[in-house]
């Protein structure tokens, strides 16, 4: 979905909304974090609670290890380092996952979030596979890329990302009916030329509007 369409396409249900933005980028001053901040600013303008989970700043370990496997098999409790993150995810009404595209997919840190945090017994039920703690939430995947959205769509990469992340992972397994993928595209890394900066600022304005629109939708 185009950013402008996403802003106008949002509807809402009516109480205090909790928006959690989750980022994967080692640079604190990156465009990734600027996008997350813009989204939260928009959400807070509609009186929502907006918080940031920077996976790098939190010291998150993305590597799926033996403890994770033992928990998956039902032989051990959830690893201690996941408890607070899962609590924050469970309490959120809206999850915004913000990350740059690396080799046509999410970075390793964000993949580790999927592997370890959205696990069996939390995101879906052991045995039955039924959705659990994410069911009914709103999810927005915001992907940053130097390419254009039109290229992602024409190449088939967009369809693959939507199928894998929005439809299969969040829709089928996690019970999230409202999951969408949005692009902050045509970015030029490390370039301070006025035209490029203006284009980036324009995208941030749209992201701020998106954050507000998502909250308004849930408040209707």
Task: Outline where the language-model segments fall.
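Glycine-rich phosphate/pyrophosphate-binding loop and the adjoining helix
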Residues: 156-220
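A short beta-to-alpha transition loop/helix N-cap that caps and shapes the active-site region
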Residues: 59-63, 148-150, 189-191
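A structural motif corresponding to the C-terminal end of an alpha-helix
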Residues: 91-92, 98, 137, 169-178
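Short, well-ordered coil/turn elements that cap or connect secondary structure elements
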Residues: 14, 45-47, 134, 173-176
């Amino acid at each position: 979905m185009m950013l402008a369409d996403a802003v106008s396409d949002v509807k809402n249900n009516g109480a205090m909304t909790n928006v959690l933005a989750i980022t994967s980028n080692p640079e604190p001053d990156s465009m990734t974090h600027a996008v997350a901040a813009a989204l939260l600013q928009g959400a807070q303008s509609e009186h929502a609670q907006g918080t940031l989970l920077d996976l790098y700043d939190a010291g998150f370990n993305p590597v799926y290890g033996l403890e994770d496997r033992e928990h998956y098999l039902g032989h051990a409790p959830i690893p201690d380092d996941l408890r607070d993150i899962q609590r924050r995810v469970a309490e959120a009404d809206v999850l915004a996952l913000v990350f740059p595209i690396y080799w046509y997919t999410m970075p390793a840190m964000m993949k580790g979030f999927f592997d370890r945090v959205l696990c069996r017994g939390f995101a879906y039920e052991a045995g039955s596979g039924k959705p659990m703690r994410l069911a009914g939430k709103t999810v927005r995947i915001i992907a940053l890329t130097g390419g254009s959205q039109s290229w992602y769509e024409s190449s088939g990469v967009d369809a693959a990302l939507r199928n894998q992340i929005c439809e299969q992972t969040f829709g089928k397994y996690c019970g999230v009916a409202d999951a969408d993928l949005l692009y902050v595209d045509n970015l030029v890394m490390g370039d301070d030329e006025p035209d490029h900066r203006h284009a980036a600022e324009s995208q941030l304005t749209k992201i701020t509007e998106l954050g507000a629109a998502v909250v308004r939708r849930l408040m209707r």
